[in-house]
């Protein structure tokens, strides 16, 4: 596999539909934990930092050293430059984000000898523990594993969710073409199920060499993130459903990105296949929709009515959360985003207003929006919620 060719640079931003931002004053509430009742009773949103970002990435030095060993640093961080705690906090403050739950995106710790991958996962998760101990009111973290090394991953999950007390685990949609529903992953799912773990799944590209050709022409070096991320997430969710993982391990909470990729559009098409293909009923007689409703999603780069309405019709409202995908989306959140994307004027994040997704107002009430951008996440991350409350009481 040509790693440089297949690792995405995330340089293109997915489209968004036009909308206007509705703004108004709100009662002042503590930044550490704004009250939903106070906010919902008035016409505006809470003041101060109140959002919870469930899709945000980080790249500490210990991880950068790992990437350098395999010549991959530029492929992963080249699109958005070096990451730092201060830089991330500055972005969060600009968009009124109280806390970000950090994770790795594409690649994670999948390259190199197994001993190096295990050691890197341990070192990264130790860094994560230290960051949470010092800034736990601003950051949660999904621990990384040395997948597809099952034995090493089981050990690291046990350590990360126990000794290190991190908020969840991050995985990829496939590992060298093996999707998450594969029976070989059963030992990992057993410990995740026993722990009642929250598992954040970031898409990667399909294991194809050469990579699927896109239709942009030779002068646009777009990677897997434009199309294949959404399609691969759909493959992974389908794999989990039809291989019985969601049925057999009901305590695992699965989180997928980008408003569900192609799944909201394809869900009912998938369900109707049961009438045409008897094997579908033999494998999953109850159908797929009940399991889709169990999944959790963020709306990173997918916060318009065209994207959120289909998802909202498919899953419970409290299963959808805010995600920024920062810093990979730094151009989307920049002050000059209208200049670089004038065709999206009216639907882009508004830096001056500190609003990362103004189009949400098209389909949600303010109370619903506060739930999407904060409360739903706090319900799923009790450790983070407790850390925020402790910080607010100081």
Regions found by a protein language model. Name each.
Residues 48, 57-83, 118, 207-231, ...:
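Active-site gating loops and adjacent loop-to-helix segments of metal-dependent hydrolytic enzymes
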Residues 52-56, 100-102, 141-143, 169-171, ...:
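Hydrophobic faces of well-ordered beta-strands that scaffold small-molecule active sites
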Residues 57, 204-205, 241, 260, ...:
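Catalytic metal-binding/acid-base residues of hydrolase active sites
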Residues 34-36:
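Sec-dependent signal peptide cleavage junction
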Residues 98, 102-237:
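Active-site gating/metal-coordination segments in enzymes
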Residues 2-30, 41-50, 54, 62-99, ...:
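Mid-to-C-terminal alpha-helical segments outside catalytic/metal-binding sites
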Residues 164-167, 194-197, 251, 293, ...:
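Glycine-enriched alpha-helix->loop->beta-strand junction motifs that scaffold or abut catalytic
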